[in-house]
Amino acid sequence: MNLFPAIDLRGGKVVRLTQGDYDRMTVYGEDPCAQARQFVEAGARYLHVVDLDGAKDGTLSNYRSIAALAEQGGLYIEVGGGIRTEERIEKYLSLDVDRCILGSVAVTDFDFTARMLKRYGERIAVGVDAKDGFVAIHGWKEVSAEKGVDFCRRLADAGCTA
């Protein structure tokens, strides 16, 4: 089993939202790299990073923080949050981020997701949230008509392994 400690970024800070509510945010630190070093010192080899600003409004306001995390090395880094275009995927992969995570776009544009899975293979993962067994998107604000299990089968058929 591989454990991925997580860093959620908002405005360049390490934060956690309460039940996904941007109005109920706790700041845990000003320096994401310092947090990552603490994870490494505790034995971590992997890191899950979520760009909450990107997820909410599609901006790249945390790009410098993510670049700094990738530059310090020592961790396998996966990034999610607001990745909706191939340009964004390329931008993150060019930083030596190891994997990009697609979220809501996997549901809203499955053809795009299938193309990215084919083009980038294991460098693409898909995050699937489910509520009452059905796929939830856009920060749990919408629930699709598709069951999570069925959606995951379609993803596997499209080549998704993570």
Regions found by a protein language model. Name each.
Residues 46-64, 104:
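Glycine-rich, proline-tolerant flexible connector loops at the mouths of alpha/beta enzymes
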Residues 35-50, 95, 157-162:
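Catalytic domains of carbohydrate-active enzymes, especially glycoside hydrolases
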Residues 28-40, 84-90, 143-155:
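Short, acidic/polar
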Residues 57-80, 113-129:
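Alpha-helix-loop-beta-strand connector modules within alpha/beta enzyme cores
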Residues 1-19, 131:
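N-terminal amphipathic alpha-helix/helix-capping segment at the start of soluble metabolic enzymes
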Residues 3-9, 47-49, 75-81, 100-102, ...:
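Hydrophobic faces of well-ordered beta-strands that scaffold small-molecule active sites
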